[in-house]
């Protein structure tokens, strides 16, 4: 059986990934953005794929856009997830909270990344990685920038005091 591709717009992802909590509750502004822009993936989703929305609230908008433009995707609501045995899930980003949410909605565990994999992604997304990566990206004299990862108030104070015009 061919897997159906499902796109999910979860703009709270970076915050959820940073927290690492399975029960993460994003701020109201992020929840509102996720709700209002749930159909954002229709603009880049592959032909014949689905876009997740919490309810059919967005269906009228999608139908109107499909009348005007060639948008060959369909809406899938959260209650429909449990009845889909084969999904290729493509969120904005994976985190423990999204994994728990989808599992709670009945998505088969085999379709979700493991907590171990999410932990690896979380570690690879940490700011400390960008500090070591930035020098590797400076390929010639036209590339610039420095990155620091400071963890303690003492480090912050020392950093500011050692630089003229900092802040």
What role is predicted for each listed range?
Residues 2-43, 47:
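N-terminal-proximal low-complexity accessory segments that begin disordered
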